[in-house]
Amino acid sequence: MSKDDLIQFTGTVIELAPNATFRVKLENGHVIIAHTAGRMRKNRIRILLGDKVTVEMTPYDLTKGRVILRHQS
C-alpha cells in the first residue's frame, strides 16, 4: 500500500491511553484509537488532552489511525 492510499482526518484528543495511544474524536463524529507517528516520537512532540490533531488511516481498518500532526493552539 502506498502513501496515496491513506486517508487523512482532523479530530480532537478525548482520552489519553498508555504507550503513546489516544482516543480521538473525528470531525465526522467517529471515535477511533490512534498512536503517535514515529517522527513525532523521535522529535518528542507531546500530545495533550483536547489537542487538535491530524490522523491518517488506512481504508482497510477505519477504527485505528496514526497521529501525524498536532495543530498549533
UniProtKB/Swiss-Prot annotation:
An example Gene Ontology CC term for this record: cytosol
Signal peptide range: none
One Pfam assignment: eIF-1a
Protein biosynthesis keyword on record: yes
UniProt keyword annotation of Ribosomal protein present: no
InterPro entries tied to this protein: NA-bd_OB-fold, RNA-binding_domain_S1_IF1, TIF_IF1
Major localisation: cytoplasm
Keywords noted in UniProt: Cytoplasm, Initiation factor, Protein biosynthesis, RNA-binding, rRNA-binding
PANTHER family listed in its UniProt record: TRANSLATION INITIATION FACTOR IF-1, CHLOROPLASTIC (PTHR33370:SF1)
Function: One of the essential components for the initiation of protein synthesis. Stabilizes the binding of IF-2 and IF-3 on the 30S subunit to which N-formylmethionyl-tRNA(fMet) subsequently binds. Helps modulate mRNA selection, yielding the 30S pre-initiation complex (PIC). Upon addition of the 50S ribosomal subunit IF-1, IF-2 and IF-3 are released leaving the mature 70S translation initiation complex.
Protein name (database record): Translation initiation factor IF-1
Organism of derivation: Rickettsia bellii (strain OSU 85-389)
Phylogenetic classification of the source organism: Bacteria, Pseudomonadati, Pseudomonadota, Alphaproteobacteria, Rickettsiales
Gene giving rise to this polypeptide: infA
